[in-house]
A protein has these predicted regions:
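Nucleotide-activated chemistry modules centered on ATP-dependent adenylation/adenylyltransferase
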Residues: 1-245
């Protein structure tokens, strides 16, 4: 079994710390990947091997992806394809001679709405937690018994500022971890317009970071119960989102 972690450079630092702690405590040999964009070529991204000490923490892989493909958004989420799917498949191709191999995904029994049987069969995806009846409380109980945990709330998972997150999660993320939005601010400055000449707008409804900041100022910080009940619905679907690949 091989455990892969595709780093975008936009995760919360505690996410990287958590992966490293899992390596140390459970004895896992995690393969840390980052995308290697093939500029000037009509081919998907490759990969580079990193580790906890060398992993990008300032959005470098993401910025490199944007330089070639433009800024992704809810209508064109190519970030998942190039930052996660492509490096993982490229690594598998080098290791096993084929890009699509049997892959276990951590979707729980209470998240089966996220499972597409057709995609699962085509992509060789398996969902052991769902098959074993493991739900969110089971997962929480397991980590409560461990000497460490992720140490970040749900809304700061994946890329801290991800445009797939709901407004309430974005507002809470901005309030709790404002420095996480420095990267999309930077992207808006260096790429003020998209390839069609339109103003770069990362978030839903063609909004910018300034719009999200204004939303937080007007609405205030949302209570946690408005957020945690949403589960992982705005998660980054590494494989299941690309049924036709």
């Amino acid at each position: 079994m091989h455990i892969l972690f595709a780093n975008t450079g936009c995760e919360h630092p505690n996410t990287l710390k958590f992966v490293h702690q899992c390596e140390q405590y459970f004895g896992w040999n995690v393969v840390w990947l980052e995308c290697k964009v093939n500029h000037g070529e009509r081919k998907s991204s490759g990969y580079r091997i990193v580790d906890y000490a060398t992993a990008s923490i300032h959005g470098e892989p993401y910025a490199d992806m944007v330089a070639k493909y433009g800024m992704p958004n809810i209508a064109s989420p190519h970030c998942t394809r190039e930052l996660k799917l492509a490096p993982i498949r490229a690594w598998c191709k080098d290791q096993f001679g084929i890009a699509i191999v049997d892959t276990c995904i951590g979707i729980r029994a209470d998240e089966t709405r996220r499972i597409n049987p057709k995609t699962a069969e085509k992509q060789k995806l398996h969902y052991p937690l769902a098959e074993w009846g493991i739900d969110k409380q089971d997962v929480l109980d397991f980590w409560n018994e461990q000497p460490f945990d992720l140490e970040i709330p749900e809304w700061l998972g994946n890329c801290t500022w991800c445009f797939k997150k709901s407004d309430t999660k974005l507002a809470k993320s901005l309030a709790d971890y404002p420095q996480g939005f420095d990267f999309p601010k930077h992207i808006e400055i260096i790429h003020p317009v998209d390839k069609y000449g339109n103003k770069t707008a990362i978030f839903r409804k063609h909004r910018t970071v300034a719009d999200i900041e204004k939303m937080l100022e007007v609405t205030g910080i949302p209570p946690e119960q408005m957020i945690t009940e949403g589960g992982c619905s705005e998660s980054c679907e590494v494989l299941a989102a690309f049924e036709d690949d």
